[in-house]
């Protein structure tokens, strides 16, 4: 294997380990700070999207209200 291939495999292993670790941590602890921060960011983005007519037209199902 070449150096580039080994580096790619290394990155894939690190990514897979991180995903498994994050999801198992989230299921074991409902108060995960990173997950709660992500929820807050998603909520803020959704609220801002609902105020923009073009974004609202594309994602009406996320806004939950009629315009």
Curated annotation (Swiss-Prot):
InterPro entries: Conotoxin_a-typ (IPR009958). The keyword Disulfide bond applies. Residues 1-21 form the signal peptide. The modification Pyrrolidone carboxylic acid is found at residue 47. It is found in: Secreted. One of its GO terms (molecular function) is ion channel regulator activity. The modification Cysteine amide is found at residue 63. Residues 51-53 are annotated as: Lacks the Ser-Xaa-Pro motif that is crucial for potent interaction with nAChR. Its main location: secreted. Disulfide bonds join 49-55, 50-63. Residues 22-46 form a propeptide. Keywords: Acetylcholine receptor inhibiting toxin, Amidation, Disulfide bond, Ion channel impairing toxin, Neurotoxin, Postsynaptic neurotoxin, Pyrrolidone carboxylic acid, Secreted, Signal, Toxin. One of its GO terms (cellular component) is host cell postsynaptic membrane. The cysteine framework is I (CC-C-C). Alpha4/7 pattern. Expressed by the venom duct. This is Alpha-conotoxin-like Pu1.1. Alpha-conotoxins act on postsynaptic membranes, they bind to the nicotinic acetylcholine receptors (nAChR) and thus inhibit them. Has possibly a distinct nAChR binding mode from other alpha-conotoxins, due to a different three residue motif (lacks the Ser-Xaa-Pro motif). The keyword ATP-binding does not apply. Belongs to the conotoxin A superfamily.
């Amino acid at each position: 294997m070449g150096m580039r291939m080994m580096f790619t495999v290394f990155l894939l292993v690190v990514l897979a380990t991180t995903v498994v670790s994050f999801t198992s941590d989230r299921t074991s602890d409902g108060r995960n700070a990173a997950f709660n921060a992500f929820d807050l960011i998603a909520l803020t983005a959704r609220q801002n999207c609902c105020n923009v007519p073009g974004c609202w037209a594309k994602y009406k199902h996320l806004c939950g209200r009629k315009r």
